């Protein structure tokens, strides 16, 4: 099977030039909603798109608002610090920024799924459900309602169109960061309308790009565990939210 590039970011480390190799419209006529988290990956995704002249809108989802005791003990995905960082990056890039509340659908489709899995003695993967129901359903439809042409995220994955005319999901070039598995729930309707600008980059290069562009999150640590459990204590979370189910 032969492949043709979709609108995926291509980076030349020698000339520092970059381009999207396919688009039905020129960048300045193309609107992209960028899912921002306040982390380095989504921030660099936004920066690369802005540099190419795309009309970007930064959107951050308020997914969960569990609070713990002590300073800084909020869940990682929606902490005030993360919101502040995402807003700072958007201001630095000169793009609009919106924070939208999706707590109810997130609880129904992700948190309840997580609790149900543990109550049945299986290990759930809530990231798959989040991508299926929240990022690439709720947020993608939100982007479409805004009139955007694409939704971009900071996932380490790539897209290619085969000679069968279908969009195929490929691994990111950084095997240690590849996220194609958690995106495997996406169908053609979603893959046609999404972009993964950093999928062709190793993580170290993404951090270098962030530092070179002066993004305020360039040295921010990655979030490795479930974003909605602020202290990574599964037992405490399940006892708090699912005592009757356990």
Task: Annotate the PLM regions.
Residues 13-14, 103, 227, 246:
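Intrinsic disorder/low-complexity detector
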